[in-house]
Swiss-Prot record:
Belongs to the TPP enzyme family. MenD subfamily. Gene3D superfamilies: 3.40.50.970, TPP-binding domain (3.40.50.1220). CDD domains: TPP_PYR_MenD, TPP_SHCHC_synthase. Pathway: Quinol/quinone metabolism; 1,4-dihydroxy-2-naphthoate biosynthesis; 1,4-dihydroxy-2-naphthoate from chorismate: step 2/7; Quinol/quinone metabolism; menaquinone biosynthesis. It catalyses: isochorismate + 2-oxoglutarate + H(+) = 5-enolpyruvoyl-6-hydroxy-2-succinyl-cyclohex-3-ene-1-carboxylate + CO2. It comes from the Bacteria. The gene is menD. Pfam families: TPP_enzyme_C, TPP_enzyme_M_2, TPP_enzyme_N. Its EC number is 2.2.1.9. This is 2-succinyl-5-enolpyruvyl-6-hydroxy-3-cyclohexene-1-carboxylate synthase.
Amino acid sequence: MSISTFNRCWSKVILETLVRHNVKHVCIAPGSRSTPLTLEAVRLQERGEVRCHTHFDERGLGFLALGMAKSTNSPVAVIVTSGTAAANLYPAIIEARQSGEKLIVLTADRPAELLECGANQAILQENMFASYPVATVNLPKPGQNYAAKWLISTLDQACHSQLVEKGVVHINVPFAEPLYEANVTEIDEHVWLGPVRRWLGQHKKWTEYQEPQLEVLMHEHWDDWRTKRGVIVAGKLPQGHGMGLKLWAETMGWVLLTDVQSGVEPTLPYADIWLANKTVREKLLQADLVVQLGAHFVSKRINQFLSDFKGEFWVVDESPKRLDPYHHIQTRFNAKAHLWLRAHPPLRQKPWLLEAMALSNFCSSFIEQQVGGSLNEASLAHHIERAFPKNAALFLGNSLFVRLVDALTKRTENYPIYTNRGASGIDGLIATAVGVGIGANQAVAAVVGDMSALYDLNSLALLKKVTQPFVLFVINNNGGAIFDMLPVEAEAKNAYYRLPHNLGFAEAASVFDLKYARPYTWADLGSVLKQAYMRKEATVIEIKAGPNDATNLYKRLLEQISFAVIGA
């Protein structure tokens, strides 16, 4: 039995284990050392067990997998070769860890005898991602002295850890040469597979764990707490977990503050703006109880409110992680938001903070007036629902635009919104959005800034792989406009923060053979979008904006609302 054939046997067992842990997508970067894993993934695709996706850039590949994990709510496998190919996955691994997405990263490696001796493309890959994975498996060089049952049970345990805590599993897989010309018949009939052949013929995990029966119990003093003044703050929630929250809050008469990532229609929209009003904010801080559902809030004003609040504080989330950066004394419920609501029946009461309702209503007309009717960065954020059809998903990039949407949009439709707000980097956003679309098999509108687009320019190649309508908005305000919010001297801000580039994206779209448009009015945009969503391919739409237009509007809104006097 050749080394190359046994490398394939070893890889077969690895990938068969992952498939039984609900892996349906495998993202592969080209490389020689990962050949045994790649070719076994291809065999699984030929049997209809998985879909294989490729990209030449490992950093983008990691984010592509991340997007698929988001929209499928299932683990996605990534295969890369040894060396810096593996290191390029680090940003996506960090984001997956911070946002609780399930990736299974397979890094091919040189065997131990080739490490630290001057061998080519050999780096120290064991535990290279430090504490970011929820489980790390450093496999030995394939050898028949290791039972197939041991390999399966080891990987099975690692994959199970993702059910306990969502995140990344890193499996480092060293292979000795030769890597090619394996005998496929010998792979499947190898005696080493004998003890697990029956398992290979079934589609079941090696270990069937019984799910813990965690009933969500009502707080013992809920009958008392529900009569008091409360605030519900909804952060990033999984799709559907905010179901019924708006009605629940309205019944209770409690103030509901919602993040754009919550999937919940706000009862008091534009909270990021009206919370700038000192009078209303101080009255809100008089609440007896704050219940936080989810985490990772975009709004600076909501975060400031949470930081300043001194009363009773409850946190509800299915993750065991700490989700309170302000370190309140708190009651913690490990539960899904909608199940917690079901366990805590509301008591019908009148709203206790009428000033917030009045100010929110005032903001509606005031923001409309200030934004105006022209097509620009702020108006696109305010009217973001005009940018995509009802059957599409929305992906919001980081930096300024996601803040504008959070502040200026009155969400009325229940459509999925995806973000990378775990570490909130501007890297890999295009790749993540493509992954969302491929995983969900639905149309996507993605909005990123110009700096984000430049950072992830390689991922424009991935737009050729979409099979549903995909619209990539690039908001080009000639640099990092978010930094206009910083109290830094103008010349230094421009030279060291904003970094104006004076570039456009028509040529970039042309290089990657993508359709491109630059609309100047809402009528132009409507015509472009009508055509774009009729095509099962990608369209790049560049929205040119003044460097300071959106930030000046944002600052002006906050300043004027802060002094507003609103009668209840």
